C-alpha cells in the first residue's frame, strides 16, 4: 500500500519543496506518525498548482535524509501530469510508523486510488495551467509595476485584487469538486473491501481534523498577509497624498522601491499559501495504504533513480490485494482517522482564512481601484495643466510673432502712406499735365484756325507767284532784247568777269578755310552740345579767343607730388600743362573774375610744392578742401557757340555736396527731382529757376530738377586740370570726354567710389565708337598736354616678314612734322611731314612672337605719347593688355597702367570683381579711389571687343582679353602735413594771418587713411593754437595776443588726427609778416577767429587792388600787393574830413547804372588782352576784401583806402525825412567801391550751405532792373551767405578771396542770418495776419510799390541807402580816419567765435519762389551793417542761435492811420568829427528789438522806434534795443506753437527751418540758445526746398564764450559808480572768449564769485570790473548784479568774495534772489536782438533807462494751462534741460512774475519749480496786468503769437 506523505506544519519552511512554499512534509516508510497528526482533507482544499517550469526564488531542503530504495511501477498519470511522485520521502524527525501500518496504509492507498480516474486529474491540471498562466501574467505585471510609475502600480494592484477574487472562486469550486471526489473515492474504496465502519469513520475524522488544522493555519497566514496588505494600502495613501501635495517635481517616488518589494513579498506569500492549499487538497485523496512485502517492489515515496526527491506513483492500484492482520488494520485505521481529523480541522481553518483573505483582497482591490482612479485624475489634471502651460508658451510665441508682424505691417502702412503721398503728388502733377494738355488742345485748335488762314494766304501767294511768273515771262522777252543790247557791251564786261572770277576764287578759298574751321568747330561745339562735343580750344587753332574774367590756368609742376597724389578726375587735380593757356570764350551771361588769389597763392605755393614731401598724399575723390577751393565762376568749359546760338542754355558741371532724397523733402512733385549722392557730378543746363532749382542730368542719364543749394559749381580751371592731356587742348573730338567727372561717383577715375557707392558711367555715343575713360593720365603717363596723337591704327596687310600699317591723323589742327614708328620701344621708321599716314615695316620676325608697334606724332608742340596709338602684331598677338603694373599707390588710392594690345579698344576695369567705369580708347591708365588702407585688392583690365568689326579667334573668351594684378594698399598712417604755410599781415593793423593749404581729404574727411580733425599751429616748435576744422585754410591772430610770435622766427602747421599729428609743414618766416602787420592797414577786412569750441578759422585773404590799365607782369607775394599808381595817388592824400553833401535818389540810381555800364565796359577790355598779360594783371589787380565774413562797405572802400568819398551825416534831432544824399565828387572811386561790394556779394554765394533767401531774390529783381547789385545787398557778418544762382550779377574783377574753401569755412563759422527782411523771418501765420491788416488799413499803395515822394530811410553800416521801387540808390560815405581806426572792427564786422556751424554735413533749405519785393525790406537789409554783427563784440554767445529780425522802416503815415516807424539817432558823447560814422556804426543805432513786457513799451504807449547811437548805452537799454510798441488791431491768437519750437534739430534729426528769429532763452546757463529756423511759405507751385537739420557745435560742459569786444576806449573807471555783480558761471577768457586779447583784458572768474563793476556796460555788452586786484572786462551775460543797499554792505560783500551756493540756487529763476538785473527781474537779461514788429504812432526817442520793475511783480503768481506736451529733454535745444519743467497738455502751471527776455516763465508744477516756455501755455499772460485793459488780451495774444517758433 502506498505511503501517504504527511503535510508539514505551517511555518516550517525547512520542510518545503523547492516548487512550493511552504512545502508538504512527507511520510517516510518505516516511520510512525505522532498521534494527533491529521492528514489533510481532499474536500474543500484548493487544487494543487502546477509548478512545472516555474522558478521560485526561495527554496529549502527537506529535513532528514531520503531513504534509498528503488521505485517501481510508477504511476503513469502522475508522471504525465508532472505531479510529485508519492514514493518520494522526506524525513521528518519524530514521525515514524511500523511496517504493518505502512502496509495497511499502502493497501488503503491502492484502494483509495481505485476510481480516482484520469478525468479529475486532467481538470485539475487544466486549472493549474490556467493558474500558471495567470501567475506568469501577474509576474510580468509585477515587473512592469516596478518600472512604471505609481498610477500604474495602483492599476496593477487593482488587477491583482480581481485575480485574487477569481482565484478564490476557483478555489471554492475545486474544494467542492474535491469533496465529491473524496466521497466517491471513499465509496469505491469501501465497497470491495469489507472494513469495519469504525475504521472508516476514524479515517474520515482524521482527515477532517487534518483538513481543519490546515485550514486554520492557512487562515492565520492569510490574516498576516491581510495585515501586510493594509499596511501597503496605508503607504499607498501616503504616497498618493505626497503626490497630490508635491506634484510632479516632488519626491513622490521616494519609497517606491520598498513598496515594490513589499508588494512582491505579499504576492509571493499569497501564491505560496494558495499552492500549499492546492497541494494539500491534491495529496489528501492520494493516501491509500502502501502494500508491504515483496509483492510491492517499489514503495510510495521512494526516490526515483534518476530524480531524487521526486515521487512517482506506483501503478499498483488495481493489482495486489494485501490482507493485513486485524490488529494492524485497526491500528492503522485509527492512525489514519486521527490524522484525517487533524487534516480536516486544518483545512477548515484554511478555508476560513482563505475566505477572509478573499474578502480582504476584494477590499484592497476596491481601495486600489479608488487610488488608481484618483491617480488617473491627478495624471489627467497634470496633463491638462501641462497642456495649458504649453498653450501659454504657444500663445506667448504667437504674441511675439504678432508683434513682429504688427511692426512690419506698421512699416508697410507708413511706406504705403508715403507712397500714397507720392501718388497724391503725382496725381496733382498729372492734373497739371491734364490742364496743360487742355491748353495744348485749345492751342491746337487755334493753330488749326491759323493753319487754315495760312493756307488761304498761301493760295493767294501762289496766285501772286503765278502772276509773277507771267511777269517773268514778259521780263524774259524783254531780257532777250536786252541781251542783244548787252552783247554789244560784252567785250567791255569780259574784263569785269575775269576780275569777278578772281574774287570768286578767293572767296572759294576763304570758304574752304571756313568750312575747315567749321568742321573743326563741329568737333568742338559750344555749350549746347556739351555731352557730345569735345573740350579744349575753339576752332581758331593756335589763336586763342579773347579772355574776359576767365579762369587763368594754374601753373602746375609736372613732377610735383601733388600731381602724383591728386586723383585724376578730382576737382583739385592739376595736370601738367604747356605754356599755352586753356582757351575759353565768353558765354551769353556775365562771367566771374579769375581766381586771382588762387593764382597768386599758387605762384607762391608752387615753391613749397617742390620741397614738400607730400603735398596731397591722399587722392580722395571728393575732398572737402579741394571742392571748397573750386572757384564758382561763370566761364564755360567749352568754346562759346556762335552769336546766333548764344541764347541757348549752356551746360555747366556741378558737384553734389550732400546726398538728397526728393521723396523725403517737402516738395509736392519729388519725382520731378533728381536724387543726389554726395560727391556726384551733375550736368546743369541753363540757369537756376525762380524756385532755386536747376535743370540737371546725372551720369546715368536721368534728368530732373536739382536743388541749387545741394550742389556746387565746379570751376573750369579745376575741370580742365582734371582732364586727360588730350582733353584739355583741342586734340580730341570724342563726345563723352566730360563724362569722366562721373567716374566712380565722385570724380574718381575707374574704380573710384563716391559716398553713395559706385556709379556707372552714362551710356554715351562717341563718334568713333570709343568708350569712356574716367581717368586722366597719371604723372608720367601720356604725352605732354596739348599734343595731339594719331588715332585708329590698323594693319592693312601682314606678310611673313613685313606689315603694312595705316592710321588716322590727329583730328585737331596741328602743325604735323612727321611720325615715328616704334617696334617694341625701338625707333624703326621715321616719316617726314606731308607723308600719308601709312608705313611699311620690313624685316620683322613676325613668327617668333608678338611685336608691339606704336606711332608717335611729331608736332610743333612736341611729340605725342606712342602708347596712345599702338597695336600688337605677329604670332600670338592679341588684344590682351600687357605690363599691367601699379603706377602709384597710397593708403586709399592706387593708379594702374598697362600697355594696350590695341589702342583702338576700350578697356573694362574691374576691382575685386566689381565693374568700374571703363577706360576709353587710347587710354592706358586707371585710378582707384576710396580704398581701404592695408587691404588686398585685385584689379583686372579687359579689352572690350566692339560689337561690329573684325574678330580674331579666341577674342570671345574674356580670359584671352584680360590681365589681372593684385596689390595691397599702404597701411594708414599719420595724416599729411599741410602745404604752403604762410605768415602774412592781416586785414587790419595788429592782425597776423597764418594761412596754409589744407591737406587733401576724401568725403569721409580722411587723409592717408585717418580722419583729419584740424590743424595745430606751432611757433618755433611750440604749439600756440589749434584749429578744429579739417578744411580750415587760415587763422587770424592778434599780434598783441601772440607775444610768442614776436620772438619766434618761423611758423609751422601740423595736421591733427585721432592717431596723432603729422610732421611739420615747411616753415614760414614770421618776421616780415609781423613788420607788415604793424603797418597801417590798407583796404582790409578782418576775418574772425573762431570760438574755442568750434576753432574753425575763417579764411582771410588780403590781395591788392589794381587797375585794369596797369597789367603787372610779375606777381607780388601773396597778401602784399599794392594798388595801382592811380589809386596810390588817391590813397596818398589820406582821409579828409568833408561835410556830407546830400544827393537825390535819382542821382543814386544814375550812379548805379553808370557803374554797371562801366563793369560791362571793363569785361571786353579784359577779354581782349592777350593770354600772357591777363594772368599777372589779374593777379595784381586785386583788392583786399572780406572772406565771406565781414560786411563789405557799400559803395566805398574802407580803412586808409577811404578817400574823399560821399558820406552820410548823422541825422540829429530825429530828422529822418531828409533824404540821404550822394556826393558827386570822386564817382570813379565810388564806382570802384561798388565793384568791390558786388564782388563780395558774389564771393558769399560760393557756399552751398547758405540760405537762398527771399531777400536775395528781391535783390536779383532789383539787379535785373538796375543792372547791378545794390550796395544794400552786401553780405552780412552774421552769415547772410548768399549762394550763387543763375541770375547773379556781373562779377567784379578786382576782388577775390584766397579760395572758396576759405569762404565756405567762414560762412560755416558765422552766426545765423541776422539781418533779413521781415517776410523772410516772420512767422507765417503772423505774416498772413499782418498782410491782412495792412490790406485793410492801407488800401492805397500796395506792398510792392511806394510813392517816390515818400522817401524811405534806412541806416547803413558805414553808409546809407534810400530805396525806391525801381532800385536802391548809392550812398557812399567817407568816414574819418580816426573814426575808422577806432571803429574798424565795428565797420568790418569782425566776429570772432560766435559763428556757429550750421552745415552739419547737410545743406540748408532749398529756395522758394520769389514774391513781390517790399521796398521796406530793402531798407531792413541796410540796417545791419553796423549792428552787433558789425561790432567786434556783437552779440553774447547766449543768443547765437537766435535770428533776430531787423525790418525795414519807412517814414510817414500810410492810409488807414498805420504809422511806419521812423528812425532817430542821437550821439551825446564822442568827438564831433566822428559823428557821421559813429552814429551809423554804433550797435545802438542798428539793433531794433522787441522788449516783451518791458517798461519801454509801457512808457512809450503806442510805441515808437528809438535808435540810440549813444556810444555808451546804459544797462537800461537792453543791448542796444529800442522801445517798441505793438500795432493795435483785432487780437489774433496763434493756434499753437509750431512743432519745431525749441526742438533740438541736431538731436531729433528733423529738418531745421532757417530764417526764423528764434527767441532763445538767455537766463539759465549761458550755453542755452535756441537755434531754430523759419519754415518758408510755399511758393505758387507748392515746391519747397528740402529742409535740413541744423547742427550746433556742442560746447564743453555748460560754459559759453563771451562776445567779442570792440577796441573802443573805456572811460576812466575811477570816476564811475561802483556796483557789485555775482558770476553766474565759470568763465575762462583764454579758452572761452573769441577776443584775441581776452587773456590780457578780460577777467576770469568762478561761479558765485563777487565782482566789482564800474559803471555801465559798453556797447559790446562788457562791464569794466575788478577782481583779485586786476582790472578788465567782464561779459554781461555771465554775471548778475547784486542788490546792495549801502556802501558798507557792498564793501562787506566784496570782502567775502563769493556767494553761498544755496543763494545761487535760489536765484536760478525769477523767484527771490539776492541779486537783480538792472533791466528785468530774475536772472539777468542777455544782450540780444529780438524780432522787430511794426509799430503804430510817431517815432519816439528812448527816454532813457527803463525803470526797475517793482518787486511785487516778481511775487505775483497766476495759473496758466499747458496747451501742448513739453519734455525739455526732447523738445528743448538748451543744454541745461534740468532747469526746465516738463508738463503735459492740460496741466495747470503756476507762473511767477513776468516772462523773461527769452519767452520763459518761472513756474511751479507738482511742487517742482523751473522754467516754462510761454508759447506752450494758454491763458492771459501776466504782462496783461501792466497794459491797458482795452488791449491787454490782444497784446497778450499777440505777444504769444509772435513767440511761436519753428
From Swiss-Prot:
Indicate the principal place this protein occupies in or around the cell: cytoplasm
Q: Does the keyword Repeat apply?
A: yes
User: What are the record's GO terms for cellular component?
Assistant: calyx of Held; glutamatergic synapse; mitochondrion
Q: Which domain of life is it from?
A: Eukaryota
Task: Please list the residue ranges that the record marks as compositionally biased, kind Basic and acidic residues.
Answer: 1202-1219, 1411-1420, 1545-1577
Q: Where is the composition biased (Gly residues)?
A: 742-755
Molecular function terms from GO: benzodiazepine receptor binding; voltage-gated calcium channel activity involved in regulation of presynaptic cytosolic calcium levels
Q: Where is the composition biased (Acidic residues)?
A: 1251-1265, 1324-1335
Polar residues composition bias: residue spans: 576-587, 1270-1283, 1705-1719
Task: Enumerate the residue ranges of region (Disordered).
Answer: 57-97, 281-318, 560-628, 726-785, 1084-1107, 1163-1219, 1243-1302, 1322-1476, 1492-1617, 1704-1755, 1812-1846
Task: Please provide the record's keywords in A-Z order.
Answer: Cytoplasm, Mitochondrion, Repeat, SH3 domain
**What's noted about domains in the record?**
The SH3 and proline-rich domain is required for the interaction with TSPO and the second SH3 domain mediates binding to a proline-rich motif in RIMS1 and RIMS2.
The UniProt function text for this chain reads:
Required for synaptic transmission regulation. It probably controls the recruitement of voltage-gated calcium channels to the presynaptic membrane, and modulates neurotransmitter release.
| Subunit architecture | Interacts with RIMS1 and RIMS2. Interacts with TSPO. Interacts with CACNA1A.
UniProt lists the family membership as follows:
Belongs to the RIMBP family.
Q: What is this protein called?
A: Peripheral-type benzodiazepine receptor-associated protein 1
UniProt organism field: Mus musculus (Mouse)
